Amino acid sequence: MLEATGRVVMVSGASRGIGRAVVECLIAGGYHVSAAVRDPRGLVGSDRLMLHRYDAESLPSAEAWVAATIERFGRLDGLINAAGINPEADLTDPDETALDAMMLINVKAPMRLIRLALPHLAKSGEGRVVNVASMSGKRVRNPNAGYAMSKFALLALTHAVRQYGWEHGIRATAICPSFVATDMTAHVTKWPREKMSDPRDIAELIATVLRLPNTATIAELLVNCRLEDML
């Protein structure tokens, strides 16, 4: 297993939910973390935690975040794409606003960050990319076609990174959770909140993936809080 000490990881979506749990877990584990937030107010940085304002809709914002991370820490060993949105984009809805937003935030933004991070991850020799996808990226079980499409696309992106980065020591993993007890699932009524996965447990799994050596890599990790009847 790789040692965390001295390794630098960027985490998007760090203001809340899984992203914030990942930041807390990695800091506790000894990593240096560059955390992307929409609004850094209310959060406190430290010698190992850098907070950076990031707008997932903006390419210049992504460029600025990666550049600031390298300027601060001098290296980059991992990228966790945890930012995401899930508005309704029904198959029959003629309004494509929500669909466009999800494809931008859930797919294009991670791709931009990965593209910008690749040279630095390759320099590490043990670079890691973890994309927080969803069980909705493995099967479709509700009318929100747009969300499922975005997560299927994120899985495809993960495998593209594996193909491109393999000879450079870059390993990519898609984490595919079902219901996680965050504000993104606050509207869910068909499954009890107390039976949903804890974001801290998802964070621990991500931390484990980061520590795996180049010779033991996971392409996709499915995490569920209930029994699957189909995949």
PLM region spans:
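Active-site-adjacent segment of SDR/Rossmann-fold oxidoreductases
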Residues: 139, 160-170
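Active-site helix of classical SDR
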Residues: 114, 150
